[in-house]
């Protein structure tokens, strides 16, 4: 029973972990890390589930950077035809490193994210008690794309394109 509960939670959390990638974009030339991300974003993508099935997903994000641009609060909602989740989080930038926390309220799970950025590319690791995912994020003006790889999780591969 405990194993089944953990597997069910892992399936749900595996997808939720990717969402934090959106909050960790690197700075544009001459701008602080998160200042250019403020506002509302939306977009679509695909989630590849364990077992080989795929689903289209829709996401909406709201970002609130601090006045210094060195920290960011977010809210993110994503849904497919079969499920949805509601994520909140915060991230802080320190030199080339980023770190933060996230909480997904539908499944009541959370964790940490850590990583680094270089130019327009961010690479990070999102972790919770029972999930880990590798994340790659590119931000280019009013467009953002990201990729999550979480082998063994319910959502093993997620790709999403967002725009303002």
Spans of model-derived segments:
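Bacterial N-terminal signal peptides
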Residues: 12-24
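Sec/Tat signal peptide C-region and signal peptidase I cleavage site
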Residues: 26-30
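Generic preference for hydrophobic/aromatic residues in regular secondary structure cores
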Residues: 1-4, 142, 164
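Short non-domain terminal segments
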Residues: 13-16, 32, 144
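Bacterial N-terminal signal peptides that target proteins for export
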Residues: 2-15
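Central antiparallel beta-sheet cores of small beta-barrel/beta-sandwich binding domains
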Residues: 31-140, 147-164
